[in-house]
Structure formats: C-alpha cells, structure tokens
From Swiss-Prot:
Residues 599-601 are annotated as: G5. Residues 191-207, 282-291 have a biased composition (Polar residues). Residues 463-470 are annotated as: G1. Residues 48-240, 279-363 are annotated as: Disordered. This is Translation initiation factor IF-2. Residues 322-338 have a biased composition (Low complexity). SUPFAM superfamilies: Initiation factor IF2/eIF5b, domain 3 (SSF52156), P-loop containing nucleoside triphosphate hydrolases (SSF52540), Translation proteins (SSF50447). One of the essential components for the initiation of protein synthesis. Protects formylmethionyl-tRNA from spontaneous hydrolysis and promotes its binding to the 30S ribosomal subunits. Also involved in the hydrolysis of GTP during the formation of the 70S ribosomal complex. It comes from Streptococcus pyogenes serotype M1. Residues 563-566 are annotated as: G4. Keywords: Cytoplasm, GTP-binding, Initiation factor, Nucleotide-binding, Protein biosynthesis. The keyword Ribosomal protein does not apply. Residues 509-512 are annotated as: G3.
Length: 953
C-alpha cells in the first residue's frame, strides 16, 4: 500500500502543512512534521474530515440525506402510547469492514477525550455502534432521541432494538450487546439523571459540530507550553554544564601553572647548584695553582735569599712576644665564655672545644692531550679518565643541548664534541676481533722481515676431462693412482709434494668436470702457479676456458702443458693458436706464458716442465715467515669412522706443530696428529706443506681458512663466536616475504620439489654434487637438498629421509647394514653412484616425473541467449541457439557481454526442449543453467570450452 506525505496532502486540499499536521495529530495519527508519511486510508480520512468540517451546519428543520453505511436490515418502530407506527424499512447494505471502523472510532474517541474530557467521550460512546459518522445524522439516531424524549425507559428501547437486529451479523450483534450493557450501567448509576439535573442539553437529531480550530489552538498552546518547559530545562542543563566545564578548565589551568612553577624552581635550583660547584671548582683550581706556583718559587730561591730570610726572622722574634701575650688574654676570655655556656641547668654538655680539622686542598690535574674512547662510554667513565667531576661534564653536555646523567652512555659523536670543548684530541679505540682470522691473510704487517725465507711454490694442475691431469701427477709422484679413478674423473682435490733439483714443489690436483667449478676456483685461490694441461688432439674445451678464467681472476702465472703429443692426431700449433684467442700467448709469439710439449703417459719432457715451474717461481719471489703462528687453507675435509674429522691443510705462513690450538673455519680443536702426503706422521709443517690433521670438533668446509691461537681457551672462544656468526648470517640470508617478492613467493609455492640427502666420501664432492643438483633446470620442479654430509649412510639419514620423503644419494660411500635394513623396512630409496654425471641424469629424470600434466584450452562452440526465464528456488534459465560448434554438458562456459568476459564456470544443466542431453549441436536450440550465476541477459554470448592435456616432450 502506498504512502503519502503530509505536505502533499496539504497541497492537494489547499491547506497549510501546519494545519494538516495538527489535524492528523487530533485524529490520533503518529506524525511529527509535514515530512511524515501516512497510509493511503489515513490520508483519505484526513481529507474527508477536512471536507466535512468545511460544510455548513445543518439545522434541525433541514432534511439531510443519511450517508449510506453498511448496516443490517432493521425495522424501526416508533411508539406513541399504545399507538404503533412502522417506519420505512432500511434496505440491506453491503458488507462493512467492522475492524477498520472500530480502529477509526477508537482513534477519534482518543482525540475527543484529549480535547473535551471523559464525560463528553462517554456521551459519544452512547451514540452507539450504529453511527458511522458523528458529523452527520441518520434516521436511526433520530429515532433513538425520539424514544428518549418521549420518556421510554432505556430497557424497553434496548429490548426493541434487540428484536429488530438481524441474526446474520454476529459481530454487529456483539457490538450492540456491549452498547446495551453500557447503557444499562449508566442508567442504573443515574448518569443520565445527573446530566439532566446539571442542565445539560439533550442530544440533537444530528451529531454536534466539532470546532477543530479551537481544539487545534488548545493543542498548540499545550505543545508550546511543553516546548517552553523543555527548552527552559535544556537551557538550565546547558548553563550548568558550561559552569562545570569552566570550573574544570580553571582547575586544570591552576594545576598546569603550579607544575610549571615547580619545574622552574627545580631548574633554578639545579642551575644554582651547578654554578656553586663551578665556582668552588674554579676557586680550588686557582688555590691549587697558586700553591704550586709558590712551591716552585720557594724551590727556585737561592741561598742568599734564605740567609736574608733567616736574619729577618730573628729580628721579628721580639715583636712576636708582645703579640703572643695579647693572644693569650683573648683566648682566656673565650675559654671562660665557653665554660659558662657549657653548663645548663645541671645537664652535661659535650665538650666542643676541639680544634677544627684542617681543610685539605684539592689537587689540580691537568687535562690529557689525547683521549682514546670507545662507543657507549658513560659520563662517569669519561670523568674518571680525564680527572674531572661528573657534574662538570653533565653541565657541559647541558650547555651543548644534551640531557644526560652520569650513568648514561654517550655515542661517539657526542664524546668527540665534548673532547673538542675541553681541547683534547679524541681518537676512537680500534678493537681487535679475535674471531676474525681473515685479517692475517689481508694484512702481513705481523711478519718479521728478518725471518722471511724462500718457500716452495704451490702449483695447481687444471684442464678438461681426460686431458691427462691425474696421469701427469701420477708420473710426477711415480704412482699409478690415476688408473683407479672411476670414469676417468678425479673425485676430490689432492695435495702432493715432490722434490726437483733440491727444491720442493707442491701440487694440487683439481677435478676437470664442470661440476667441480667451485673446487677449482678454491684451488686457484691458494696456488702460486697454474699448469694448464691441454690435449694436443682435442684442443681447447669448455673446462679449459673456465680454468683460464679462474687463473686470470687469481692473478697467477700460467704454464701451458700440451699433453698427448705422442698421438698421431696431435697438433700443438693448433692448440697454441686457439689459446691465443683467449689471451694465453706463448713467449715464442711475444707473450708471457710458457708452453711445454709433454707426454705424461710416456714421461716425455716432464723434467723440462718442472724446470719451467722453478724458473717462474724464482721470478715470482715467493717468501714466507716460518717463525710466526701458522695460517693456511683447507684443501679437503672428510669424516672418518675411527678418527673423526680429518682435514687436509696447506700451510701458507708460519709453522704448524702438533698440539697447537687451532681454529679451522667455524670449528676449533687441537692438532692431535699430522700426516704428510706420503702417509708419514710429522711433528711440524712449514710453509707450502700439505698435511692432514685430526682433533677438530666438527668437519670444516673445503676452502676455509685456519689459524693457530695462543691457547686452547682463546681458540675455543673464537671458534664458538665464528659458529654463532655463521648461524646468524644464515638466518639473515633467509628470504622474507615483502611487497617486492610477494608474487615470486606465491609463484614458488606452485613449484614441485624433489628432496634429496647427499652423502659422499669427501667434503668437496658433497659441495660439488649439491651445487650440480640445484642447478638442474626443469620447469616447475626444483631440487631441495635436505641434508648433505661426509661419511657412510647411517640410520639417522634413513630416518630423516622417511620424515622428509627424500631420496638418499651416496657418492663413493655405502650404507651400513643397519641403515640398509631400516631403509627396506621404511621403504626409503637409496641410490649409490661413483660418477657424478650419472647422478645428475638420474635426478633430472625424477624431476620430470614430478611435473603436473599441462593442459591446453580447446573451444567447442558458441551460443547466443535468445530468452531468459527466472524460476523461483531454481535460478535463471537461458534459452539459447548454437551458432558455432556445439555445447556439451561437461564443458566449461564463459559468459561474454559486450566483448567482456563477466563469468567463467561450469554448466548446472543442459536441456533440448524438455529432455536432458549431453550436447546441443550447431543451429539447435536448448536451455541451460550455469552454476552460481543467474545474471543471464538476452544477446549474451556463451562460449563452451574444455581443457586438454598436452603430452610433454
């Protein structure tokens, strides 16, 4: 049902909004202003009431046509004595809405009660249910008044009415019963009699006229009075709130002024105390300085002045006697006065006639010329160092704008400014980090130039796979270890020392495979000379170029050994030309690199190669100091089951002894035993000597530096500190999610991982294998090295593999019987290898198997929505026609509107006429519903598609 606002009703009937609002309130409607809304029935009621109020009064003589109301058929009989006159029977009206009428009358009666009082309301209620409108008269009302005027009793009239009521309208009869009972009660109580006695007029044949203007004016006056009372109450409340707020502000202001005054008094007291301390300090400094000057003058006085002083003192003795007598009399008087003052009413008073203690003069300390400070020194520490009072320094800092206490730490800049104010040169103290062993390799000032001697050169042999590096080293050592290498590849770095022409040469053998790039780089960092071995029949290969780059980066000279010249296809000139392209130019061509043609297999020109090495070493002037504590580099490290951690070290400076406390990388320990390259125990190792040691608490990393410390306590502290720093650095390197890398992190979450555990015989192989596996590039899959270590595969590795769903890869190691049994029980896979590129190929195949299938979108067809049908509790059904291809039940669909995709989802149903079908072909019509989408519109395009799997190549 629609609603109307009061100002619209006022405009419609030509009245002011104010009058309409007051009239609506009078009718009992809940309105507040001209913007209030009322129901359409209430609006009609307001309009009709205005129209009735505007009609002229109808006199008693005028005949007014009664308003047709829905009443039952009633025959009214007028009685005059014994005479019965029958009036015209009222025609049967239409059915009435009694409930609405009752509600309207109730509202009207409430308004009348408020305006005229309860007595008039009772009179209106006696008008009965049959009056549809109190502003009009009806024939039935006239009859009731006639009955009362003729003196009929109320009981007879009620009985007559009851006999004429039609039994068809039960509700009407009930209302009549209520009216009759109300009339009887009034008659018994004598209310009608009282009304007549009080001179009230009998009700007329028509309803009394209501003066709406008077009632509205009275209501408005009452509202104005109520509003004035409320306004006065609000005004008083506001005045009281303002008064309380003003009091609160005054109290807060007084408290602030009081606090400010206290703060100013404290500040003045502090400044006064500082000034007093400063004046005392100045006076003490002046007195101390004058005392010192007088002392120096007395000491510098010659003997003649001393004699004159002696004579003058003898001449003054006579005058002193008279002064002494006067002083004795004065002292006697003072003593008598003190005696009289001591005794008070028999009380014992302590004797205070003791001599005052002499005041010790404060010593004057000169400021130092230099001040060495550390970050975070306190004011008290600085005052103690420069021999000044902390209060003085606090005051200076206060004048500089720095608020500090004597226990507060100061930064370096503040300390320097303070020293400038005192005129002292400030220097920051350089703290030596005992845990930093890298400083020994960067700064050689700790070496003694008098003890520096010539040392053996460290030579690294580099080259491509199977170009003869190990064969050359085997020939140099007269050993055949090269034949035992799997696949023709050296598995770890070895260090060997030979003697030629009374001089020693240390050789490092680096692997030739690309996987050992980091190991070769580590070898180049400790070497003095590089022997680049190139096969005469193969020429320059990729690993040869890498070896050249590592040697150039290390800044070491290169000696080229062209091997396999005994083969029929050997072409040394081609090798020389190819190396020239990479900056390795022979001395025969005007370059700086020495070229030697050899045959490692047949021991040809090996002596010439060694002589070339010694010649280059002599040119390089390799020196070392064997008297200092030893430092060097870890060549290789491994874990032995019986001996523990074993590290192969190359001593670079100093001499390493057994029982030396040592720090190796992030580990520490004491050298228990030392073994040289021949397997013999030695007690010391000089510079350029490779040895294997035991006694470390953990296995170090290949390439770590080592240093010998003064005692085991210092070594332990340095090792633990380095371990903590390494752990902290590892945590800091952990990538955290930020706005910049958030997308990459989310993308990485979709990548599959292959977890592996690596166990190898030596540390270098572990690092090389882990680096090679991580570099394998398979889109969508990566290798995650869960754990890598040196040693055999044990039960802990199997347990870790089971927990992390990893594969164990053993390189040149075997599992223990217990580990193999546990792996069979827990279904853990163990792969054993001795050739590195076999491991890489196997892991790459496993990574490809981890990939999810790749899908490609295939368009099936298109359809146009011709009509839409909305079904309650079901959704929107789209009637469509296929214009291209087909639409299948299991396909996905896109809803395209104005060339923009607005939804992408699955079909909920597909029908052809009334039948469920699996597909609808081209030029056919059907109906469809889309899951979770009901916003289909005519002319929308439906694109059907499926995702097909693509076979990986």
């Amino acid at each position: 049902m629609s609603k109307k606002r009061l100002h619209e009703i006022a405009k419609e009937i030509g009245k002011s909004s104010k009058e309409v609002v007051e009239h609506a309130k009078y009718l009992g409607l809940d309105v507040k202003s001209h913007a209030s809304s009322v129901e359409e029935a209430d609006a009609k009621k307001i309009i009709s009431s205005f129209s009735k109020a505007s009609k002229p009064d109808v006199t008693a003589s005028q005949t007014v046509k009664p308003k047709e109301v829905a009443q039952p058929s009633v025959t009214v009989v007028k009685e005059t004595g014994s005479e019965h006159v029958e009036k015209t029977q009222v025609s049967k009206p239409k059915s009435r809405n009694f409930k609405a009428e009752r509600e309207a009358r109730a509202k009207e009666q409430a308004a009348r009660k408020q305006a005229n009082g309860s007595s008039h309301r009772s009179q209106e209620r006696r008008g009965g249910y049959r009056q549809p409108n109190n502003h009009q008269t009806n024939e039935q009302g006239d009859k009731r008044i006639t009955h009362r005027s003729q003196g009929d009793t109320n009981d007879k009239r009620i009985e007559r009415k009851a006999s004429n009521v039609s039994p068809r309208h039960d509700n009407h009869q009930l209302v009549g019963d209520r009216n009759r009972s109300f009339a009887k009660e009034n008659h018994k109580n004598g209310r009608f009699t009282n009304q007549k006695k009080q001179g009230r007029q009998e009700p007329q044949s028509k309803s009394p006229k209501i003066d709406f203007k008077a009632r509205a004016a009275a209501l408005k006056a009452e509202q104005n009075a109520e509003y004035s009372r409320q306004s006065e109450t609000r005004f008083r409340a506001q005045q009281e709130a303002k008064r309380l707020a003003e009091l609160a502000r005054q109290e807060a202001k007084e408290a602030a002024l009081k606090a400010q005054a206290e703060e100013m008094s404290h500040r003045e007291a502090a400044l006064k105390s500082i000034e007093e301390a400063e004046t005392k300090l100045k006076s003490s400094n002046i007195s101390a300085k004058s005392t010192a000057d007088n002392r120096r003058k007395k000491q510098a006085r010659p003997e003649k002045n001393r004699e004159l002083t002696h004579h003058s003192q003898e001449g003054q003795k006579k005058n002193k006697k008279s002064w002494n007598s006067q002083n004795q009399v004065r002292n006697q008087k003072n003593s008598n006065w003190n005696k009289n003052k001591k005794t008070k009413k028999g009380k014992n008073v302590k004797n205070t006639n003791t001599a005052p203690k002499p005041v010790t003069e404060r010593k004057f300390h000169e400021l130092p010329k230099e001040f060495e400070y550390t970050e975070g020194m306190t004011v008290a520490e600085i005052a103690k160092r420069i021999k000044r009072e902390p209060a003085e320094i606090v005051k200076k800092l206060f004048m500089m704008g720095v608020m500090a206490t004597q226990n507060q730490s100061l930064d370096g800049d503040t300390i320097e400014l303070l020293m400038v104010d005192y005129g002292i040169e400030a220097k920051a103290k350089v703290e030596v980090d005992d845990a930093d062993i890298e400083r020994f390799f960067e700064d050689e000032n700790y070496l003694n130039p008098e003890n520096i001697v010539e040392r053996a050169p460290v030579v690294t042999i580099m080259g491509h796979v199977d170009h003869g590096k190990t064969t050359l080293l085997d020939t140099l050592r007269n050993s055949r270890v090269a034949t035992g290498e799997a696949g023709g590849i050296t598995q770890h770095i070895g260090a060997y020392q030979i003697e030629e022409a009374g001089k020693k040469i240390t050789f490092l053998d680096t692997p030739g495979h690309a996987a050992f790039t980091s190991m070769r780089a580590r070898g180049a960092s400790v070497t003095d000379i590089t022997i680049l071995i190139v096969a005469a029949d193969d020429g320059v290969m990729p690993q040869t170029i890498e070896a050249i780059n590592h040697s150039k980066a290390a800044g070491v000279p290169i000696i080229v050994a062209i091997n396999k010249i005994d083969k029929p296809g050997a072409n040394p000139e081609r090798v020389i030309a190819e190396l020239a392209e990479y900056g390795i130019i022979s001395t025969a061509w005007g370059g700086e690199c020495e070229f030697v043609e050899i045959s490692a297999k047949f021991n040809k020109n090996i002596d010439e190669l060694l002589e070339t090495v010694l010649l280059v070493a002599e040119v390089e002037e390799l020196k070392a100091d064997p008297t200092v504590r030893a430092i060097g580099t870890v060549i290789e490290a491994r874990l032995d089951k019986g001996k523990g951690a074993i590290a192969t070290l190359l001593v670079q400076q100093g001499t390493l002894h057994v029982q030396d406390p040592i720090v190796v990388g992030n580990t520490f320990g004491r050298v228990r035993a030392m073994v040289n390259d021949l397997g013999r125990r030695v007690k010391s190792a000089e510079p350029s000597t490779p040895v294997s040691i035991t006694g470390l608490n953990e296995t170090p990393m290949a390439g770590d530096h080592f240093a010998v410390y003064a005692d085991e306590k210092a070594a332990r502290a340095a090792g633990e500190e380095r371990s903590k720093r390494a752990l902290l650095k590892q945590r800091q390197n952990t990538q955290r999610v930020s706005l910049d890398n958030l997308f990459d992190t989310l993308k990485a979450g979709e990548i599959k991982t292959v977890n592996v555990i690596i166990k190898a015989d030596v540390q270098g192989s572990v690092e090389a294998l882990a680096a090679s596996l991580v570099k394998i590039e398979v889109e969508g899959v990566r290798v995650n090295v869960v754990h890598s270590a040196v040693g055999a595969i044990n039960e802990s590795d199997v347990t870790l593999a089971e927990a992390s769903n990893a594969v164990i890869i053993g390189f040149n190691v075997r599992p223990t019987p217990q580990a193999r049994q546990q792996a069979d029980t827990d279904d853990v896979e163990i792969r054993l290898h001795s050739i590195i590129y076999k491991v890489i190929e196997e892991v790459e195949e496993a990574m490809k198997g981890k990939l999810d299938p790749v899908y490609q979108e295939k368009i099936l067809g298109e359809a146009i929505i011709r009509e839409t049908f909305k079904v309650s509790k079901v959704g929107t059904i789209g009637g469509f026609m296929v214009i291209n291809g087909k639409v299948t039940r299991d396909s996905s669909v896109r809803v395209i509107r104005d060339s923009v995709v607005i939804f992408d989802g699955k079909l909920a149903s597909l029908k052809h006429y009334k039948d469920d079908v699996k597909e609808v072909g081209n030029a056919q019509e059907g109906g469809l519903m889309i899951e979770n989408f009901n916003d289909l519109k005519v002319d929308d395009t439906i694109e059907a598609y499926i995702m097909e799997e693509i076979v990986r190549k």
